[in-house]
Amino acid sequence: MQTDTQPMSHPLIQESSQVDLDVLEAIQQRILWLAVRMVDSANNDRTADEVKVGGHQASSASLVSVMTVLWFAHIGGSDKVAVKPHASPVYHAIKYLTGELDRSYLTRLRSFGGLQAYPSRTKDPDVADFSTGSMGLGVVAPLFAAAARRYVDAHGGPTSQEPARFIALAGDAELDEGNIWEAVTDPSLQGLGNVTWVIDTNRQSLDRVVPDQKIKKLIEFFRGAGWHVVEAKYGSLLQGEFDRPGGDILRHHIDEMPNEQYQSLFGLEGPALRARFLEHAPDGLAEFIAAWSDDQLGRTVRNLGGHDLGLLIDSFRECDSVTDRPSVVFAYTVKGWGLPIAGDPLNHAAFLTAKQIGELRSVAGLSTDTEWDRFDPATPEGRLCSAVGSNINNRPLAPRPTLPIPTSAGQAVPGKPTSSQEAFGRILTRLASIPEVGNRIVTTSPDVSVSTNLGGWINKVGVFHPDEQPDYLSDGRLLRWKQTRAGQHIELGISEMNLFMMLHALGLAHELHDEHVLPIGTVYDPFVCRGLDALIYALYNDARFVIAGTPAGVTLAPEGGAHQSSITPSIGLELPGLDYVEPAFAQPLDWLLCDGLRRLAEPDGSSLYLRLSTRPIDQTPFADCAEATDMERLRQDVLAGGYRLREPDGAPAEVVLATCGPVTPEVLGAADILADEGLASVVLDLTSPSRLYRDWRVSLRSASREARTAHPTFHLARLLPHHERGLPIVTVHDAASHHLAWLGAVFGARTVPVGVDEFGQSGTIADLYESFDLTSGQIANAALVAVS
């Protein structure tokens, strides 16, 4: 059996306008077998552990047909696909058949160093285009990747690249996730005609059958958002019966049948199946199907479009023909298709028995000696697998380019009190003028660009829009909101999840689009938590970007507790792949931002989290420190995580005051008070607590692994000479007090942590600092407690 396809949708079809569905059927059956057997092997062929290995045979089976058509009759090498998490065995089976995955991995699903439970960009040997596993995020990742590709293309990206399509495979229950709808409705993501989502509509979630009206509502949601909707609902066998005289009765009955009733048909045979199917049936339906045998009835009523290969090819072709908006295909499938557990409401975590595995092996035409074999290369199936592999399998990726990023943007040290947020905006504007750097920077913000000091940058580079827009409101305004294809700022709606997903997409532009950009996002600091799942997802994928959380802390006094962050520094310190910095002064911020942009391209680099403030701070203390210190040494200390801002005056220090961010003036004031009391102190400005901590932790881990004494080669040991390492420490931070409390453990010193351990409220900075013991007098008292 053959069907027409689009000539340019697949490597083999470039020479032929036909796809042999019999070959696809054979490949589909082998993929089903391998996916199911991989899960079976993981749970039964290894030494038993205390924890169940798990896996999803039924969820994999429901997408076998869709993925067979996509990989073997639709996508090409430039296309990117996000695989439904629970279908990861299907993905690995495809990568094995096409030659990318070594056979040894098939028995290492969910094992250390083997195949991950869910598709992973960073952990799997057959690198996935998008990691999936955190529900909802993998679904929208291709949508944001398409937006990033649109941006790259508009800014002179590689002209040799073929056009790319971005596809997501999602379960129908996954559409419960709210971040999906935040993305679907965002104006910046409209008009992406190279995006297709395929919804695995098997009507089952983890615990239950999906309620009846849900799918209809979802379809209307997509249509209301301007998406093109395709329903691959009924297979050709069932469609043929609908076309017979009286077939409209059959269609109406199935359309109106409750999901629970329809799902129950998969567990019934013979007269019981017929009786259940005819419950609440309209007049005439019993006569319409009277001539059907029980077997024919079962084959017909279970014939859904999500398992009809020809219909799926046509559905994807239709999506390709719509180029002015995204498309979504609702592929009606059977959870557990082709397996004895098909349609069982409790099949999500069910495993086939050894007897059932043996029967499935026989259906696949295999034996225990051949069960892991690929197709013979000389067969039509083998030739197709080879051709697909040569076109779509991953190739080595060139490293990110080294850019001429300076150590400083050349921002003059302000002569007046300046906030770190204000300095950030000025530094960014100066970076725009640096060749090969400014043109690669792209900023994005969830409708807070002006209030996070991106106004100067936007005036200089403009706002990105795929089609130039008229500007009716800029006359006489300080902010010029000019929207063109050349703009370098992407404005999002008020969604922090979308912000981090956009940063994720831009931060992988080199890997996905062969173009390295420098993404910088801004967000109100307390709402870093609101987008935390997407932030973690981006870092897990090794996306590289800069995020500025500003304004931060109770220093944002008038805004009240809802806008005053306290735990975000802990997030910055504890997340892998993220360097958290909180400079108090403008020059260290300049150094840190330039260094952070440089690290985005390094193989072992990281993303950068700037925690900033709107509080103007006198820059004189840093200028005095710089005058008394070698400037390059000072810069290196700042980048390493901290420097000695003030030395004890005359007498040896008796206490260490460690701080960062906007409370630094209060700490310096406390040092003055202590000096008047005859107590000398050293003040450390910790520009990056996360770098300090990790440096110390690496030293300890290395020593513990080698069973030796840890040598004090970490940066904090360089900041505190031997005679100061046992001194009491007072840590002061506009954040949760525990965030810096670990400092005392480094050298076994008595520690008094001062910080924000309750929710704030509206007031002045003086009010809030008094409330949280952040005034100079209270900090001095804490130092007296520490030394007492």
Spell out what each predicted region is:
Residues 78-79, 150-160, 508-527, 545, ...:
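Glycine-rich phosphate/pyrophosphate-binding loops
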Residues 168-169, 197, 444, 547, ...:
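Residue-level marker for buried hydrophobic side chains located in beta-strands
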